[in-house]
Structures are given as structure tokens and as C-alpha cells.
């Protein structure tokens, strides 16, 4: 049984590695030199490491181990990670990524969402 009309599909574009600007925050491709200090400071607000419970990485006990994580090639391809900057807090306080990026079939997922305590439950 045919449902609807056939759709002509052209290969989708790979996501741009540009800054994504929103009303309350912006996302930038992860840059360890620029973002690591803020991110580590803000993620360290979670003293028990609870925010990392369902993540396959972290929590990070030292700044150097966290910065090393941010510099891995795993964060710049597929998945592709962004640092989240809160305009209200004026600091980088989260991570998010695109993953399972398949332009040839037009699919993409969002994941690895990690908000520091000071970003959780905010607008």
C-alpha cells in the first residue's frame, strides 16, 4: 500500500561548524584552549559526579584530565561537540553534540547533553 507522494531526496549537508546563536545561549564547536577552564569550573559544582551517571565518560577529578578529554579527536567528527555558553551566566557551562550524522540518508541525532549545575533548570 502506497502512502503519500514520492519525495525527491538530495543528499543533506554535513552540519556547519559555525557558532549557533540563540536567545539565551550560543553553541560553539569545542575549543579546549578557550572553553576548558569555564567548563571544568562549572562541571565541578557537581561535587558527587551525579551529572555524569548516565554518560560513558566523566566525572573528571582533575583539570588536566578534563582538558585532555576536550582535545580528543572524538569530539570533532561524528559525534561533533559544541560548548554551551549561557548569556545570563556569562560562562561556558555545558556540552552537546550532533551524532550519527549520515548526510547521505538525511539523518542526525542530538546527544551527549551535559549541563553544569548552574545551567540546569534555567531558561
Where are the regions that the model predicts?
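GNAT-family acyltransferases
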Residues: 1-123
Amino acid at each position: 500500500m502506497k502512502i503519500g507522494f514520492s519525495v525527491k531526496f538530495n543528499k543533506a549537508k554535513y552540519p556547519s561548524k559555525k557558532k549557533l546563536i540563540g536567545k539565551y545561549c550560543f553553541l560553539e564547536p569545542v575549543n579546549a584552549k578557550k572553553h576548558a577552564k569555564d567548563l571544568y569550573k562549572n562541571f565541578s559544582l557537581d561535587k558527587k559526579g551525579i551529572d555524569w551517571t548516565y554518560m560513558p565518560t566523566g566525572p573528571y577529578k582533575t583539570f588536566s584530565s578534563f582538558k585532555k578529554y576536550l582535545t580528543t579527536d572524538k569530539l570533532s567528527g561524528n559525534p561533533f561537540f559544541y560548548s554551551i555558553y549561557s548569556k545570563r551566566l556569562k560562562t561556558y557551562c555545558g556540552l552537546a553534540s550532533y551524532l550519527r550524522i549520515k548526510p547521505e540518508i538525511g539523518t542526525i541525532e542530538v546527544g551527549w547533553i551535559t549541563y553544569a549545575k548552574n545551567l540546569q533548570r534555567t531558561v
